[in-house]
């Protein structure tokens, strides 16, 4: 069917200049949030978890980002299970874990743990710290935020655009979890739902954000960053294989993405940020996987509808994704 002829539900871009990040879910955790949204891949048939004896026995080292002894965790197949294992190792409630970074204790958004973990990656868990409420006057349509989520019900700030409305409010920082907007709880919401709410707030009015920042060690208390930058932090992990976490079905050990796939994923993630105000490398990876063998944009659109229909991607976005995958295939970077 030609693209755009009633093949799926239509929706305008959630965020035009504002950004929302593809959730860290990278695991497609398909739980409906308070706003009625649901995780990607919810329509797929669920597979029973494999017997424990058949799961790959992989042991990872972990620390709390603000400082702790080193723990060892194993036997998880998705982000929620991972957070549970970390909580057990450090005797914390699982709900205290906000997100994890790989190979750095810093709040580095380029090192967020998504749906893949290198076999020698070191996991740093960032837990809840100080809570704060901030009043924001929406003087412009775009607030300058990029939102992501952790795949387990928490949406947080991944990037703050320089010179934006939010950039002028020093109390708001990258890594802050968005608990509520004007008293409406966002716990359990996906990144794109939070981005939509922020976009729909009326211009020229004040709204209240309830935030929780990651707990900081003394050496981490400094001027806030506008977001991660490539190359920051030590590279502790050297394993070439990755453990891919899934919300349905077993975790699998896979090779790292090819150069083409890495570049295509990066470009699609940029498109997600531009169109929807979200960043989500795992969502981008899923889209590249769906599109790399398709012959035309219509086939890609049908595949996206079938697998990721809840996102209701606009036609122009699908065309740009098709173009990004095609450019990466022929080396046009």
UniProtKB/Swiss-Prot annotation:
Keywords: Cytoplasm, Membrane, Phosphoprotein. The gene is Gipc1. One of its GO terms (biological process) is negative regulation of proteasomal ubiquitin-dependent protein catabolic process. The modification Phosphothreonine is found at residue 242. It comes from Rattus norvegicus. PROSITE patterns: PDZ. It comes from the Eukaryota. InterPro entries: GH2_GIPC (IPR055349), GIPC1-3_GH1 (IPR056814), GIPC1/2/3 (IPR017379), PDZ (IPR001478), PDZ_sf (IPR036034). This is PDZ domain-containing protein GIPC1. One of its GO terms (cellular component) is presynapse. Interacts with SDC4/syndecan-4 and SEMA4C/semaphorin-4C. Interacts with RGS19 (C-terminus), GLUT1 (C-terminus), ACTN1, KIF1B, MYO6 and PLEKHG5.
